[in-house]
Amino acid sequence: MSCILHIETSTSACSVAVSEDGQNVFKKEDLNGPSHAVSLGVFVDEALSFADSHAMPLDAVAVSCGPGSYTGLRIGVSMAKGVCYGRNLPLIGLPTLKVQCVPVLLYHEELPEDALLCPMIDARRMEVYAAVYDRALKPVREIAADIVDENSYREYLDKHPVYFFGDGAAKCKEKITHPNAHFIDGIRPLASMMFPLAEKAIAEEDFKDVAYFEPFYLKEFVASQPKKLL
């Protein structure tokens, strides 16, 4: 098993964790953000100091790589790459929507065997970033930007119970009313939930090229024009 620094900044929450041998031993979270530019550097410094003071040499840095907030992802990935360069560590990039699935799989044993998971990240209006996975986190449908209406995900709902969660799911409750649709509240991507996926990546030696790795934005960033003053 390994000692890993985890960084998650894809949504308004900012979180950092250290895991050792598959258990979280340190975590810092600000759930009331976005405060990534202010908080992330402090959290990472505290995490590194904790690991150093407890004689826990890091084996890798894992970062949640999107989709999500353009600014949050850019800050998180830049920080992760900086630590990798500074300490000569390998980089792990984890899909944010898979990270969201971890607490559902860990803490919701009531899920039936044929259940499908649909993590959602709020985009804008009725749009979400979403994917569909089975319980083994194998993709049933790849990540996409969906405009949700009454017929969304019907091809899956007609055959399986589908569990929707994440900060994009709340606004979909009134639209997705199929009897096989289930909603789980209170789920968000957090650094403390990254360790199972990061451990798997280390076991498979699934590392990213630190020099060229970029976040998965899914959509290009479009800056809004400032309003003209009258």
Feature map (PLM): residue ranges:
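Stable alpha-helical structural segments in soluble proteins, enriched in small hydrophobic residues
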Residues: A47-A51, G86, V104, M194-I202
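N-terminal beta-alpha supersecondary unit
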Residues: M1-P67
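Residues at secondary-structure transition points
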Residues: L31-S39, Y70, R74, S78, ...
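Phosphate-handling active-site elements
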Residues: A51-L58, Y85-L94, E110-P112
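Acyltransferase
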Residues: I184-L230
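Surface "functional belts" at beta-alpha junctions
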Residues: Q23-V25, S35, P90-P189, Y217, ...
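DPxDG-like acidic metal-binding loop motif
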Residues: A62-T96
